[in-house]
């Protein structure tokens, strides 16, 4: 008979064999499970990255054997999410003489992707009136300015006025002297009749080439204008004189370009390129010219090229709820 020690030895061998077998089985199962988990994670990661991929090209053609150019299907339809204002002079409505012409224009713009509820045709009396109180409330604003010899300068200053944001404060010339401190610092005069006179002062507040007590000796900068952007020598105090009853003048700082505004000059020998004005920095390209024919032809052309015009602009991105001294024009 086997001894007790021998029996225990065999039992220990059987126990370790069973234990090792079970351990190997569990280890094999766990390794398979971990492998499956790793494989599934890699598969899900690879698939999700492809699904969320975005084609950032704009109207990029697909080259190869295809015969057509396919536009990017993710490109936004601007007209569906934006508002468009077109400002036109009263003379246009008078010439067209059709009570339904606005409806016709909006229906034509619908064919270009602009819903009738997103388009507003706003009339202004003349450039002078419009420049004194421009209301540019849409995401995209297009101003039609009819060129005539007597309003050439008005268009030029209106363009500079509208294509930039201005931070302005009213000037009290009866109490204070004023100076311009930098290139963006201008004085803007608006009203029915603005004649601006100035007398530059030295460090002792004595007039340079003029008498501070005699406005007849002041230098005349503007004469009977409705809108004037005034530039004087920086860093020099000036005594200013103007007719308060028919004009108001503000001390302004030119800020960022108003990229949601474009001006179309209708008629004239050539477009008034305000970017050539040394007062205008940086250069702008949102002003163009259209041949003058009839107002119906003007609006047909606007409709035909509306989306091309919009591409030169940027949608309004900031609120109009600002202080009364901040002219978002």
From Swiss-Prot:
Ca(2+) 2 binds at residues 180, 231-232, 234, 304. One of its GO terms (molecular function) is metal ion binding. It comes from the Viruses. Residues 168-170 are annotated as: CNP motif. Disulfide bonds join 85-138, 168-252, 194-247, 199-210. Its main location: virion. InterPro entries: VP7 (IPR001963), VP7_1 (IPR042207), VP7_2 (IPR042210). Residues 1-53 form the signal peptide. Glycans are attached at residues 72, 193. It is found in: Virion; Host endoplasmic reticulum lumen. Ca(2+) 1 binds at residues 98, 209, 217, 219. Gene3D superfamilies: Glycoprotein VP7, domain 1, Rotavirus outer-layer protein VP7, domain 2. N-glycosylated. The N-terminus is blocked possibly by pyroglutamic acid. Keywords: Calcium, Capsid protein, Disulfide bond, Glycoprotein, Host endoplasmic reticulum, Host-virus interaction, Metal-binding, Outer capsid protein, Signal, T=13 icosahedral capsid protein, Virion. GO terms for cellular component: host cell endoplasmic reticulum lumen; T=13 icosahedral viral capsid; viral outer capsid. Calcium-binding protein that interacts with rotavirus cell receptors once the initial attachment by VP4 has been achieved. Rotavirus attachment and entry into the host cell probably involves multiple sequential contacts between the outer capsid proteins VP4 and VP7, and the cell receptors. Following entry into the host cell, low intracellular or intravesicular Ca(2+) concentration probably causes the calcium-stabilized VP7 trimers to dissociate from the virion. This step is probably necessary for the membrane-disrupting entry step and the release of VP4, which is locked onto the virion by VP7. Belongs to the rotavirus VP7 family. Some rotavirus strains are neuraminidase-sensitive and require sialic acid to attach to the cell surface. Some rotavirus strains are integrin-dependent. Some rotavirus strains depend on ganglioside for their entry into the host cell. Hsp70 also seems to be involved in the entry of some strains. Homotrimer; disulfide-linked. 2 Ca(2+) ions bound at each subunit interface in the trimer hold the trimer together. Interacts with the intermediate capsid protein VP6. Interacts with the outer capsid protein VP5*. This is Outer capsid glycoprotein VP7. It comes from Rotavirus A (strain RVA/Chicken/Ireland/Ch2/1979/G7P[X]).
């Amino acid at each position: 008979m086997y001894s007790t020690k021998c029996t225990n030895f065999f039992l220990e061998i059987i126990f370790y064999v069973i234990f090792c077998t079970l351990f190997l089985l569990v280890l094999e199962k766990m390794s398979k499970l971990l492998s499956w988990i790793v494989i599934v994670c890699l598969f899900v990661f690879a698939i999700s990255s492809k699904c969320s991929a975005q084609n950032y090209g704009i109207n990029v053609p697909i080259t190869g054997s295809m015969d057509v150019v396919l536009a990017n299907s993710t490109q936004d339809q601007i007209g569906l999410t934006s508002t468009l204002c077109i400002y036109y002079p009263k003379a246009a409505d008078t010439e067209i003489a059709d009570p339904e012409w606005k409806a016709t224009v909006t229906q034509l713009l619908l064919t270009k992707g602009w819903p009738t509820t997103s388009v507003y045709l706003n009339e202004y009396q003349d450039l002078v009136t419009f420049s004194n109180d421009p209301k540019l409330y849409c995401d995209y604003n297009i101003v039609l300015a009819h060129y005539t010899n007597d309003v050439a300068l008005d268009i030029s200053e209106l363009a500079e006025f509208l294509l930039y944001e201005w931070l302005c404060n009213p000037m009290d010339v009866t109490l204070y002297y004023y100076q311009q401190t930098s290139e963006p610092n201008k004085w803007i005069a608006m009203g029915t009749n603005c004649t601006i006179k100035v007398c530059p002062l030295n460090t002792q507040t004595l007039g340079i080439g003029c008498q501070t007590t005699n406005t007849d000796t002041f230098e005349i900068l503007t004469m009977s204008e409705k809108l004037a952007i005034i530039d004087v020598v920086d860093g020099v105090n000036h005594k200013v004189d103007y007719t308060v009853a028919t004009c108001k003048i503000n001390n302004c700082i030119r800020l960022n370009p108003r990229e949601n505004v474009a001006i179309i000059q209708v008629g004239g020998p050539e477009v008034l390129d305000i970017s050539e004005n040394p007062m205008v920095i940086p250069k702008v390209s949102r002003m163009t010219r259209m041949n003058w024919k009839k107002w119906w032809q003007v609006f047909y052309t606007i409709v035909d090229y509306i989306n091309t015009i919009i591409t030169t602009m940027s949608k309004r991105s900031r609120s109009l709820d600002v202080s009364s001294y901040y002219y978002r024009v």
